[in-house]
Amino acid sequence: MPKPGNLVEVTNPFISDDLGNTWLGVVVGESNVTLTVHFADDNAIHEYRKATINNPDSNGYIIMNVVS
């Protein structure tokens, strides 16, 4: 499990559903974890989104909607 502050690189985490929505799925392995997801595009526009996993039944899996 990565320690707080460590950079975690996820390869090809994007999932598309039947409706054509794009989602970002990350497995972190435990609950009560806050993730900061860094989005950067080719124009060097950076966006940071925070999401907290605090459901012990979630098995440490988070899915975020990706706005296109």
Model-derived features: positions:
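Short coil-to-beta transition motif at edge beta-strands of beta-rich domains
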Residues: 1-17
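Short beta-strand-centered aromatic/proline hotspots
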Residues: 18-30
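Intrinsic disorder/low-complexity segments enriched in polar/small residues
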Residues: 4, 10, 31, 48-51
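Short aromatic-glycine-enriched beta-strand elements
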Residues: 33-36
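A generic structural signal for ordered secondary structure
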Residues: 7-12, 23-25, 39-42
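Intrinsically disordered, low-complexity, charged/polar segments
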Residues: 40-68
